[in-house]
């Protein structure tokens, strides 16, 4: 009896263990089958498997598996060009954009006067653009500070760039000697934008036209000036027979106008078409030729240079179209200039009216040939996709340049807007900004200066200002010892 009772618990425990194992195994098999047939898909047949299927004529196929193969093939084996869904034309239409953004604008009313169109202003309430003024002011202030930091750089200095541009041998006449920049002032005030409104204009290159933003801009800054010195050379009967020293100072007293901004669709020929299209040339500007054949030749040369610069700017796209920003000013702008001149060596003439008229006319023509309707400036917009090369940390004191090797000679702690400056740097910048007075860059008058670059000295600045107050006709950077004409 004792042997029977001991065998029964052993058999019961063994049957319980077997049942537990079988149950667990069945659950695992069910879960695996569910994952395999309901979650995972079938693997794509390899080349060897497909060849085996072609060579085996006795292999049977079922209708259910065939239908499943057709369905998976229709979903997986789509051409790559059909992966991206097409954009409906209604979503890029100007009316659709205005309707979805709750903006009411009237269409453009085209007239035949001078080949231009006169748009009706939108019925939407104009915007004040106070936030935009703050952003633009911060950008301009940063550019001014960066230009001052780079004043000693041999390649990135604004002084060297202006000197290279003014002394271009292909554009400078032979009777003008080397031009020396004696004074640069980047100004102290900022432009004020206001009264922004959006209009719809017709554009043959885009379906449904495009939108254009009009905004009023006003700038009053007496410290935005440029002073140069040069010599007029008499090359007859022999080269450099005589020279006439000339000193000029041009200041922008006030500028006001209407700025037009629009986005140009991404086409590879957008910039060239806008810059050289015959329909975009105003006949009134063609007839306003005050210098004859030479002026027309210079304009053609400048248009060629503009086209080459545009092509060079778009060379980095490698054929990939980019959306561009086109901006221009309406012809009813106002540009007030203050031109001061000093001509002569021993007996000098100050503020000659004819010289002021010639300089103002040349500046006006230069401005109209570039950014006044119907001519526009087209700028390719950079990519805004987040990249690690452009990633920075806000508030970090020491920022290292990430992904850019061209600015190795510039201290990132001074020019980076992301890094916070230390207390000593802030104190030096505050003292410098208080003494800079418009960021005027002047050449050091000392002949023994080894760097011969642009230097700023508060003592020299105070002495020059005192001399200017004593003599109201003195030009910043002009020739010394003015002798009135008797």
Swiss-Prot record:
Its main location: endoplasmic reticulum. It is a single-pass type I membrane protein. Keywords: Endoplasmic reticulum, Lipid transport, Lipid-binding, Membrane, Transmembrane, Transmembrane helix, Transport. PROSITE patterns: SMP (PS51847). GO terms for biological process: mitochondrial genome maintenance; mitochondrion-endoplasmic reticulum membrane tethering; phospholipid transport; protein insertion into mitochondrial outer membrane. The keyword Endoplasmic reticulum applies. Residues 70-79, 429-440, 462-473 have a biased composition (Basic and acidic residues). This is Maintenance of mitochondrial morphology protein 1. Homodimer. Component of the ER-mitochondria encounter structure (ERMES) or MDM complex, composed of MMM1, MDM10, MDM12 and MDM34. A MMM1 homodimer associates with one molecule of MDM12 on each side in a pairwise head-to-tail manner, and the SMP-LTD domains of MMM1 and MDM12 generate a continuous hydrophobic tunnel for phospholipid trafficking. Residues 41-486 are cytoplasmic. GO terms for cellular component: endoplasmic reticulum membrane; ERMES complex. HAMAP family: Mmm1. Residues 45-98, 269-318, 393-412, 420-486 are annotated as: Disordered. Component of the ERMES/MDM complex, which serves as a molecular tether to connect the endoplasmic reticulum (ER) and mitochondria. Components of this complex are involved in the control of mitochondrial shape and protein biogenesis, and function in nonvesicular lipid trafficking between the ER and mitochondria. The MDM12-MMM1 subcomplex functions in the major beta-barrel assembly pathway that is responsible for biogenesis of all outer membrane beta-barrel proteins, and acts in a late step after the SAM complex.
């Amino acid at each position: 009896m004792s042997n029977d009772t001991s065998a029964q618990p052993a058999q019961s425990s063994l049957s319980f263990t077997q049942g537990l194992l079988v149950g667990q195994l069945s659950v695992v098999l069910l879960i695996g089958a569910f994952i395999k047939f309901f979650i995972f898909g079938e693997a794509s047949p390899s080349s060897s498997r497909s060849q085996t299927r072609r060579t085996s004529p006795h292999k049977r196929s079922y209708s259910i598996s065939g239908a499943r193969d057709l369905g998976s093939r229709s979903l997986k084996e789509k051409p790559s060009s059909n992966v991206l869904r097409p954009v409906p034309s209604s979503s890029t239409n100007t009316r659709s954009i205005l309707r979805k953004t709750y903006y009411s604008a009237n269409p453009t009313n085209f007239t035949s006067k001078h080949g231009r169109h006169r748009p009706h202003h939108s019925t939407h309430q104009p915007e004040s653009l106070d936030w935009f003024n703050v952003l633009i002011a911060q950008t301009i202030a940063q550019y001014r500070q960066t230009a001052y930091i780079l004043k000693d750089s041999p390649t990135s200095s604004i002084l060297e760039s202006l000197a290279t541009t003014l002394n271009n041998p292909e554009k400078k006449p032979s009777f003008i000697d080397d031009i020396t920049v004696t004074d640069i002032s980047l100004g102290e005030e900022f432009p004020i934008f206001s009264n922004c409104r959006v209009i719809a204009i017709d554009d043959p290159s885009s379906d449904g036209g495009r939108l254009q933003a009009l905004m009023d801009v006003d700038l009053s800054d007496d410290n935005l000036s440029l002073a140069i010195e040069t010599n007029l050379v008499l090359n007859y009967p022999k080269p450099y027979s005589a020279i006439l020293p000339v000193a000029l100072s041009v200041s922008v007293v006030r500028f006001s106008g209407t700025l037009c901004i629009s986005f140009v669709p991404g086409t590879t020929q957008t910039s060239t078409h806008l810059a050289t299209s015959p329909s975009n040339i105003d006949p009134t500007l063609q007839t306003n030729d005050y210098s004859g054949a030479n002026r027309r030749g210079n304009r053609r040369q400048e248009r060629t240079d503009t086209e080459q610069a545009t092509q060079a700017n778009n060379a980095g796209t490698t054929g990939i179209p980019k959306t561009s920003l086109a901006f221009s000013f309406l012809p009813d702008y106002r540009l007030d200039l203050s031109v001061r001149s000093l001509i002569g060596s021993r007996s000098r003439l100050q503020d000659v009216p004819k010289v002021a008229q010639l300089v103002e006319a040349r500046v006006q023509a230069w401005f109209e040939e570039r950014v006044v309707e119907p001519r526009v400036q087209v700028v390719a917009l950079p990519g805004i996709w987040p990249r690690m090369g452009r990633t920075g940390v806000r508030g970090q004191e020491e920022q290292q340049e990430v992904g850019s090797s061209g600015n190795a000679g510039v201290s990132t702690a001074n020019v980076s807007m992301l890094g916070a400056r230390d207390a000593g740097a802030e104190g030096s910048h505050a003292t410098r900004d208080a003494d800079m007075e418009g960021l005027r860059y002047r050449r050091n008058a000392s002949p023994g200066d080894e760097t011969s670059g642009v230097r700023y000295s508060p003592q020299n600045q105070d002495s020059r200002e005192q001399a200017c107050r004593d003599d109201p006709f003195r030009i910043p950077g002009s020739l010394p010892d003015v002798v009135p004409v008797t």
